């Protein structure tokens, strides 16, 4: 079965529309205008892998508007409503890419760190890398993205705690970075933007990490060091698994009663290959949506670790892989108009007070005395970074994709373009470019054409688990100011 070779969507000029910003209400993400809860249908987006972040050559995943337009169109057709971007340069202009994803109805979750020296916490010696120069760069990331309405939130760390050994020293520093980021946002942004942590799904430290970051020191519910959201990179569902065999039932039981939104910041085991993505119906089904707020598929662009949905070539052309079609077909099995139309609960959640008894694993840090703000950093928190990056939504004159894109059978797609959605509408799986008002049901496809059906290609092998190489690499810090 071959994919249809035409995608029809509006490609002309349009005035900038904006998705509604999301807020955290208890354990849910909530649309600030409709009051509906929001489920993340996400995609990890790091074009070029680690090489895609190259400050010396003015390059990062959100700096090329034509590439963003190409990828936004393909992800919009897939049904993605959120992208996660790992490594960004605050000195580059991201207006065009942010505006394109905004028009396509997609939010952005931004990691404030990068693999370069001085741009992340060193998990081996976090006290050496927590200083004003490091914080200055994280604040600059906030400045660069705070004004985009589709900025969903920031991750203060990614898999910095991956063992009991790192759990002994790292947690207070991640919590301190969270505190500093939230105070900076409070002083310099016009809305509260969630800050959270993306954890490795290492069961020895997962529960303790969650409890360490979600609790309130001295019972103060306004504690600025408390995470606004908690996410995990999990690859425990492989192939034709089940809710029980994958251990998803254990995760639901673990996070039952969470006081902050919990979601998968990465998922998508890559064996068998091609992938089958049978976890989609569970993640967005009744067994999980009361506890989890969706998840982020790892990942859009094919890299050496073989998790991609699309081969993105150096000349700008794209070859879609079988996994793209499979994921699209799995999304079609979910009634997202119902999933996204649930009114957020108004029940007050219980926020645990930080106590040593919350920590179960012997050797994991159970001290909630945090490092003081490092010398020179408080002045930046109070007065802002300088020079100050400024981001804004801009009008896009043409949403037409100019790069050649081929499906998994080698057919060239024609008429590919981003379809700008109406104001306050986010994307949803379904017809190409159709959207939902973050919980108010499916919108109509103004072009009148249905999204293509992409046929999976090739046989499936026996399921097995494989964990990808960690996305966040942590190096000994050096001093770097923007």
Regions picked out by a protein language model, each given a short descriptive name:
Residues 65-119, 171-196:
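Aromatic-lined substrate-binding rim segments of carbohydrate-active enzymes
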Residues 272-353, 357-367, 371-376, 380, ...:
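Substrate-binding cleft of secreted/luminal carbohydrate-active enzymes
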Residues 2-3, 8-24, 28, 450, ...:
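N-terminal signal peptide
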């Amino acid at each position: 079965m071959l994919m249809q070779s035409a995608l029809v969507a509006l490609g002309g000029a349009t005035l900038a529309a904006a998705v509604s910003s999301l807020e955290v209400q208890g354990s849910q993400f909530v649309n600030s205008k409709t009051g509906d809860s929001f489920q993340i249908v996400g995609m990890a987006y790091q074009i070029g892998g680690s090489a895609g972040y190259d400050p010396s050559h003015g390059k990062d995943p959100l700096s090329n508007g034509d590439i963003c337009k190409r990828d936004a169109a393909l992800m919009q057709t897939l049904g993605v409503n959120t992208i996660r971007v790992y490594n960004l340069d605050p000195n580059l202009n991201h207006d065009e890419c942010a505006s394109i994803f905004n028009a396509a109805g997609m939010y952005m979750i931004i990691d404030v760190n990068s693999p370069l020296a001085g741009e992340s916490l060193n998990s081996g010696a976090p006290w050496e890398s927590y200083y004003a120069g490091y914080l200055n760069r994280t604040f600059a990331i906030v400045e660069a993205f705070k004004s985009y309405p589709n900025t969903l939130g920031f991750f203060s760390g990614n898999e910095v705690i991956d063992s009991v050994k790192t759990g002994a020293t790292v947690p207070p520093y991640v919590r301190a970075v969270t505190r500093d980021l939230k105070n900076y946002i409070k002083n310099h942004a016009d809305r509260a933007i969630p800050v959270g942590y993306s954890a490795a799904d290492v069961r020895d430290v997962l529960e303790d990490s969650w409890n360490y970051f979600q609790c309130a020191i001295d019972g103060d519910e306004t504690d600025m060091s408390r995470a606004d959201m908690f996410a995990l990179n999990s690859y425990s569902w492989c192939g034709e698994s089940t809710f029980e065999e994958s251990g998803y039932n254990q995760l639901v039981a673990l996070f039952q009663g969470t006081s902050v939104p919990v979601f998968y910041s990465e998922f998508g085991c890559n064996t068998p290959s091609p992938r089958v993505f049978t976890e989609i119906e569970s993640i967005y089904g009744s067994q999980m949506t009361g506890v989890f707020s969706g998840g982020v598929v790892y990942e859009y662009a094919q890299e050496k670790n073989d998790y991609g949905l699309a081969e993105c070539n150096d000349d700008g052309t794209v070859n879609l892989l079988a996994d793209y079609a499979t994921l699209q077909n799995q999304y079609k099995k979910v009634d997202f108009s119902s999933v996204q139309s649930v009114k957020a609960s108004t029940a007050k959640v219980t926020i645990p007070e930080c106590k040593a008894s919350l920590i179960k694993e012997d050797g994991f840090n159970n001290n909630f005395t945090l490092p003081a703000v490092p010398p020179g950093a408080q002045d930046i928190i109070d007065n802002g970074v300088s020079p100050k990056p400024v981001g804004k939504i801009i009008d896009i004159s043409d949403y037409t994709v100019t790069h050649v894109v081929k499906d998994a059978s080698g057919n060239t797609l024609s008429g590919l373009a981003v379809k700008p959605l109406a104001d306050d509408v986010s994307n949803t799986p379904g017809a190409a470019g159709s959207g939902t008002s973050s919980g108010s049901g499916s919108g109509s496809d103004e072009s009148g054409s249905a999204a293509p059906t992409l046929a999976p290609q090739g046989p499936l092998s026996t399921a097995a688990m494989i964990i990808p190489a960690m996305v966040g690499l942590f190096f000994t810090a050096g001093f770097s100011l923007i």
